[in-house]
């Protein structure tokens, strides 16, 4: 039976079956091929899409806008300073207003409960562009990228290690994605930065059905041995006070992805992934401040690894657009 996701919200991967997730990845691969060959068919002509960004973004905004334009839709960008959400109007009321004007709504912001409320009351498909807890569109792009760089293999045949802050939205979402798709994931982090135990338990229950393997460890060499992919994210998240940097950098320094970690995988073909932006040199304001304060060349990843043949981060970034397009086409397309 054909998979239909028409009018569905896309709020977190926990809401989707492995078959539905694979369907979205396959659709993204097909849409990417169609765009590259100049044969893309527009299925969102006449659709109006609202993009709500309570947190600013480069990749997510551009990915949604280009994906929408490619498919013939019009977008309205509502930035951090351009809305009354939560100030003069509740999300429940905002959802019901925007749902009368728009055919689909993207939300990037704070608590998962906010996008869940938007999805409950909008009456049109709502897509999670990032919350504090989950980042599902990024995971679709990650899984698609892994498949592209492991030709002939399926997701259950692949393994990856995530190093760093495993309790953030990326650690959470990668664990859910791996559990759903039967993969081998190793979360390599200080124990105080492991995901919430309730989510770990939920993912282990999913893994018992899908065959996924979930490992939590503080040991870098154990965690990265023989993996196909290494993954990390920033150690300091958006909006965190600088006062928190010193302790965070001290705790995370052993989990930096550098040439020693590449070697420890014992896999000369291992690939490096990052959702971006990355602090890999001193060419950003944060990078300069970190180098001056702590003497580090790069934070979560070194320049050497980031710019090496192991790195597939820009393929991964491009695939954000293709997978976001797949979500919109599947849930809203004609």
Curated annotation (Swiss-Prot):
Taken from the UniProt record, the cysteine pairs bridged by disulfide bonds within this chain are none
Reaction catalysed? Answer: carbamoyl phosphate + L-ornithine = L-citrulline + phosphate + H(+)
Task: Cite the binding residues for carbamoyl phosphate.
Answer: 57-60, 84, 108, 135-138, 275-276, 320
Name the domain of life: Bacteria
**Record's subcellular location:** Cytoplasm
User: Record-annotated residues binding L-ornithine?
Assistant: 169, 233, 237-238
**Record-listed E.C. numbers:** 2.1.3.3
Q: Which GO terms describe its cellular component?
A: cytoplasm
- Which InterPro entries is this protein grouped with? Asp/Orn_carbamoyltranf_P-bd (IPR006132), Asp/Orn_carbamoylTrfase (IPR006130), Asp/Orn_carbamoylTrfase_sf (IPR036901), Asp_carbamoyltransf_Asp/Orn-bd (IPR006131), Orn/put_carbamltrans (IPR002292), OTCase_ArgI (IPR024904)
Give coiled-coil spans as residue ranges: none
Q: What class of enzyme is it?
A: transferase
- Hydrolase found in the keyword field: no
Q: In which pathway does it act?
A: Amino-acid degradation; L-arginine degradation via ADI pathway; carbamoyl phosphate from L-arginine: step 2/2
One of the GO biological process terms: citrulline biosynthetic process
Keywords of this protein's UniProt record, alphabetized?
Arginine metabolism, Cytoplasm, Transferase
The UniProt family comment states: Belongs to the aspartate/ornithine carbamoyltransferase superfamily. OTCase family.
Q: Which HAMAP family match?
A: OTCase
The name of this protein is Ornithine carbamoyltransferase, catabolic
Kindly list the organism's lineage.
Answer: Bacteria, Pseudomonadati, Pseudomonadota, Gammaproteobacteria, Enterobacterales
Gene coding for it:
arcB
């Amino acid at each position: 039976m054909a998979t239909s996701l028409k009018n569905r919200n896309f709020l977190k991967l926990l809401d989707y079956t492995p078959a539905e997730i694979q369907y979205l990845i396959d659709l993204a691969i097909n849409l990417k091929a169609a765009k590259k060959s100049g044969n893309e068919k527009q299925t969102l002509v006449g659709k109006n899409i609202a993009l709500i960004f309570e947190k600013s973004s480069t990749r997510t905004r551009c990915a949604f806008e280009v994906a929408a334009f490619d498919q013939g839709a019009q977008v309205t960008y509502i930035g951090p300073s351009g809305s009354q959400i939560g100030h003069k109007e509740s999300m429940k009321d905002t959802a019901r207003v925007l749902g009368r004007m728009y055919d689909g709504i993207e939300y990037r912001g704070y608590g998962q409960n906010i996008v869940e409320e938007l999805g409950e009351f909008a009456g049109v498909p709502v897509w999670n562009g990032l919350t504090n807890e989950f980042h599902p569109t990024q995971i679709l792009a990650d899984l698609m990228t892994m498949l592209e760089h492991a030709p002939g293999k399926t997701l259950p045949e692949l393994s990856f290690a995530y190093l760093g802050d495993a309790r953030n939205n990326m650690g959470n979402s990668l664990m859910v994605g791996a559990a759903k798709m039967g993969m081998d994931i190793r979360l390599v982090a200080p124990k105080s930065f492991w995901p919430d135990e309730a989510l770990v338990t939920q993912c282990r229950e999913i893994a018992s059905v899908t065959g996924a393997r979930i490992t939590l460890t503080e040991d870098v060499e154990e965690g990265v041995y023989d993996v196909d992919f290494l993954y990390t994210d920033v150690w300091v998240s958006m909006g965190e006070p600088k006062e928190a940097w010193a302790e965070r950098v001290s705790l995370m320094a052993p989990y930096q992805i550098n040439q020693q970690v590449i070697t420890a995988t014992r896999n000369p073909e291992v690939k490096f992934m990052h959702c971006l932006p990355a602090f890999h040199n001193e060419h950003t304001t944060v990078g300069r401040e970190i180098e001056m304060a702590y003497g580090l060349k790069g934070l979560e990843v070194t320049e050497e690894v980031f710019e090496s043949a192991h790195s597939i981060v820009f393929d991964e970034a491009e695939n954000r657009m293709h997978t976001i397009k797949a979500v919109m086409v599947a849930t809203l397309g004609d």
